[in-house]
């Protein structure tokens, strides 16, 4: 089993072989690093059983706690600037995508990301004989963020 958080191929890049194991792909709809359509394309090409999680308004870093580091000091980019280092534009974008005003606060998505990741792995690895907490309706109970789960059991 595998989980891919914000995944995609670069234009012109050869597509990797399709895994023959259950998979889950998660993407933020406001990801400026890997377009959500690229993650959707990976999901579309996967073998079932497969799961796709879309997090509305979330950027690239929604799947990490990087946005929480030095939040009150301008985040990671602010901290780097504070110590006098220059960060190339490409790295500035990467270090802030998902942490900016107008994007979903990543901490609001953590409960859904954590729950769906664990539920998927428990089922896929045989710990749970039937899916538990992998129904699309469950996302409404996890967070006030809009999280959409698409399931293709095969």
Regions found by a protein language model. Give the residues of each.
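The feature captures the conserved acid-bearing segment of alpha/beta-hydrolase catalytic domains
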Residues: 1-63
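Alpha/beta-hydrolase-fold serine-hydrolase catalytic core, especially in secreted/extracellular enzymes
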Residues: 48, 66-154
């Amino acid at each position: 089993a595998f989980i891919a958080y914000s995944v995609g191929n670069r234009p012109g890049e050869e597509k990797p072989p399709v895994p023959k194991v259950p998979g889950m792909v998660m993407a933020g709809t406001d990801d400026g690093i890997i377009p959500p359509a690229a993650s959707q394309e990976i999901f579309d090409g996967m073998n079932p059983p497969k799961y796709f999680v879309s997090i509305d308004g979330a950027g690239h870093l929604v799947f990490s706690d990087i946005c929480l580091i030095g939040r009150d000091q301008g985040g990671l980019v602010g901290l780097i600037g504070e110590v006098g280092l220059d960060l190339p534009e490409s790295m500035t974008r990467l270090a802030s995508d998902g942490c900016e005003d107008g994007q979903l606060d990543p901490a609001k998505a953590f409960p859904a990301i954590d729950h769906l990741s664990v539920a998927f792995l428990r089922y896929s690895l045989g710990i749970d004989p039937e899916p538990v907490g992998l129904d699309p309706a469950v996302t409404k109970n996890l967070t006030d963020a809009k999280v959409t789960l698409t399931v293709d059991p095969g």
